């Protein structure tokens, strides 16, 4: 299994909606609102790196109101 933390920056006012959408994804193990540069921290787990990349690019980053993400792979 490949695990990563994804730090997500949302458009102002869309943080709560984005958090609810993110929590619906099966690969999301945990997700929390935060204060600071990033609005949400997400723990994701996928079968391999290819699937993780696909999920981040084609699901998480495609949510309306997502401005930027930073992915930190767990070693």
Where are these regions (language model features)?
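A compositional/biophysical signature of low hydrophobicity enriched in polar/charged and small residues
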Residues: 1-75
